[in-house]
Amino acid sequence: DSDGKLHIYIDGKITTKNKRNNDDDRFTAEITFTSLDNVELTGVCKLETIGDFMTAKLKVDLSGASKMLVGGDFLAKEKLNIELSGASNLKGQMTSPESTFDISGASNLSLKGNTVHCKMEVSGASKANLEDFPINELKAEVSGAAKAHFQVKEKISLHTSGAAKATYSGDPIIL
């Protein structure tokens, strides 16, 4: 539309070949674009990217049972902001000097790449696997029954509560 946003949705009912909607029906849209700085997925949907992307700032907001698979290297030159809620899932390779993650519900985050400064909250029954995502400086809160695994190089501030479990590799200074 006129604000530079692409909205994809189903308006009304779609009848498939077998004349009824069922759980096996899938609808696919293939889109080619040159820039991407904001992704918002809600409900039961999936986004797969192919190739490398570069942007100044990237915001990803996944909710419901949405899924995003990054099939190349995604470079956010200034800031990366990821919010996952519900049973959402994000997997791929991302790089940014500054990253903020808010993972809640039963969501899953699995990243490769790296960041310099990272703030993270992992709660509920969520999982964050950042063992292949080196972080120079991490400030993290892990709560509920969440699980998080990090690779930290320089400094770490880590707080856990409830039945949460957090592990890290590296030899950072504990703040």
Task: Give the positions of each predicted feature.
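Acidic (Asp/Glu) and glycine-rich low-complexity loops/linkers
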Residues: 1-63, 67-83, 91-98, 110-112, ...
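Short, surface-exposed interaction patches in beta-rich subdomains
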Residues: 79, 90-175
